[in-house]
């Protein structure tokens, strides 16, 4: 189990670099988009002032995803080793969009932040990396990322400290976001781990990811309502050198300039896209 557990947590937390855009413009925003569908979101605590302009046109362009190291984002999440009751389908609207009501305040308050790769102990293992952030607020391990002109790649996982002996590189990196994102966008990614260790134990896996932007609509949170969110479905199939494989489904709700505002991750072995229990249910909140 030492072989499978940590490695499984890596890929299934995946958290899609959507954590990263959220770190750029979470609850720290000042000002809201205007009623006509446009507007600026200003990010005040990332050093130099950074702005992002969203137009709520149903498409998330690369320019509508910003990365500001040091910005903190707060989420509500179910406690470790619990299952949250969820409804990923939401309610249908007459215009074909959907409404997801995530206004429930239950769960623990957690904080995530984005850091740069400069000066990190693992920098030499990931020379192309730019950023790092925890994959799961309930675990210390970090996802390592590269943000390009048309995608954000997950390059691997590391522990915060070198003494833990956790380094899991992906070959090739997994494009967890591809731009532009709009309803119907889909892509797949295959990746393997080589020369990887989790707490000093060698690990190896072959992973296949399928990404689909499969819905658009309104997300209601305790403090905020987003009227033009995209839902990204990720299906992961993971095969190990020893032991059974793993399959999971994850949903991310993405918004221009805010990034990820909600997430649901199914239990292992889930095949129903309308699953009703999640090992992780995360919502942006104070």
Model regions and ranges:
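Extracellular-facing segments of soluble proteins and assemblies that are Gly/Ser/Thr-biased and enriched
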Residues: 120-208, 212-213
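Short, structured coil/loop segments at alpha-helix boundaries
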Residues: 12, 154, 255-257
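Acidic, serine/threonine-rich low-complexity disordered tracts
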Residues: 26-35, 39-126, 189-286
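Bacterial N-terminal signal peptides that target proteins for export
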Residues: 1-14
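C-terminal motif of bacterial Sec signal peptides marking the signal peptidase cleavage site
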Residues: 20-22
């Amino acid at each position: 189990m030492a072989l499978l557990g940590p490695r499984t947590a890596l890929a299934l937390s995946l958290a899609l670099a959507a954590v990263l855009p959220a770190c750029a413009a979470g609850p720290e925003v000042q000002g809201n988009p205007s009623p006509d569908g446009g507007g600026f979101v200003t990010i005040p605590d990332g050093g130099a002032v950074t702005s992002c302009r969203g137009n709520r046109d149903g498409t998330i362009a690369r320019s509508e995803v910003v990365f500001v190291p040091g910005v903190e984002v707060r989420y509500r999440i179910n406690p470790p080793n619990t299952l949250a009751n969820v409804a990923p389908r939401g309610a249908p609207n007459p215009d074909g969009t959907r409404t997801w009501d995530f206004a429930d305040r239950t769960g623990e308050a957690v904080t995530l932040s984005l850091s740069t790769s400069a000066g990190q102990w693992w920098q030499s293992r990931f020379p192309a990396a730019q950023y790092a952030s925890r994959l799961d607020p309930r675990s210390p391990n970090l996802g390592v990322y590269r943000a390009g002109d048309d995608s954000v790649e997950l390059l691997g996982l590391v522990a915060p400290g070198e003494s833990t002996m956790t380094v899991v590189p992906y070959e090739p990196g997994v494009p967890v976001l591809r731009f532009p994102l709009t309803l119907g966008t889909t892509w797949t990614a295959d990746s393997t781990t080589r020369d990887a260790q989790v707490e000093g134990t060698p690990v190896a896996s072959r992973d296949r990811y399928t990404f689909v932007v499969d819905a658009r609509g309104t997300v209601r949170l305790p403090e905020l309502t987003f009227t033009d969110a995209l839902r990204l479905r990720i299906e992961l199939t993971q095969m190990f050198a020893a032991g059974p494989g793993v399959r999971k489904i994850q949903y991310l709700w993405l918004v221009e300039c805010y990034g990820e505002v909600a997430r649901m991750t199914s239990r292992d072995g889930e095949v129903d896209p309308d699953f009703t229990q999640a090992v992780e249910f995360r919502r942006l909140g104070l």
